[in-house]
């Protein structure tokens, strides 16, 4: 065990977070996301919500400030609707952890899948919220 690491962050996920460079993206997917079809590097976080993972990741992760929106979520398919509480809960979780909220953008379902293919890794969570997937983009970690 390490001090200060949230219990939702597995050793495999901690390794991935440390390996990622600036500009790399991480997909936090819901339980139904086709991760293994889209990507070769998949970590399982079964039974863990995306909010729990964001609580653990945000203090360890510098969100990209060189891109317009370092957070990306899927937009609703035509004729379907989003629950705005899902996005708001993610943003509030990040704000609580780091004090500010990076900008969030939405993209079409299939564009999101294509973007996920280019990510550093995909984390399959226990999240069941509709359109609950989120991509987070890592920035440059400041040297202190």
UniProtKB/Swiss-Prot annotation:
GO terms for biological process: fucosylation; L-fucose metabolic process. It is found in: Cytoplasm. It holds the Pfam family RbsD_FucU. Its EC number is 5.1.3.29. It comes from the Bacteria. It is an enzyme of class 5 (isomerase). Keywords: Carbohydrate metabolism, Cytoplasm, Fucose metabolism, Isomerase. It catalyses: alpha-L-fucose = beta-L-fucose. InterPro entries: L-fucose_mutarotase (IPR023751), RbsD-like_sf (IPR023750), RbsD/FucU_mutarotase (IPR050443), RbsD_FucU (IPR007721). The active site is at residue 22. Pathway: Carbohydrate metabolism; L-fucose metabolism. Substrate binds at residues 30, 109, 131-133. GO terms for cellular component: cytoplasm. GO terms for molecular function: fucose binding; L-fucose mutarotase activity. Homodecamer. Belongs to the RbsD / FucU family. FucU mutarotase subfamily. Involved in the anomeric conversion of L-fucose. This is L-fucose mutarotase. It comes from Histophilus somni (strain 129Pt) (Haemophilus somnus).
């Amino acid at each position: 065990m390490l001090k200060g690491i949230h219990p939702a962050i597995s050793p495999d996920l901690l390794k991935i977070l440390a390996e990622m460079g600036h500009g790399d993206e991480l997909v936090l997917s819901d339980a139904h996301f086709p991760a293994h079809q889209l990507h070769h590097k998949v970590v399982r976080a079964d039974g863990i919500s995306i909010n729990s993972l964001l609580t653990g990741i945000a203090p360890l992760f510098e969100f990209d400030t060189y891109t317009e929106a370092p957070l990306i979520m899927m937009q609703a398919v035509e004729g379907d609707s989003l629950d705005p509480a899902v996005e708001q809960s993610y943003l509030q979780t990040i704000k609580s952890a780091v004090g500010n909220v990076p900008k969030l953008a939405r993209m079409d379902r299939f564009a999101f899948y294509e973007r996920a293919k280019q990510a550093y890794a995909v984390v399959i969570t226990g999240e069941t919220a509709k359109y609950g997937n989120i991509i987070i983009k890592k920035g440059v970690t400041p040297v202190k």
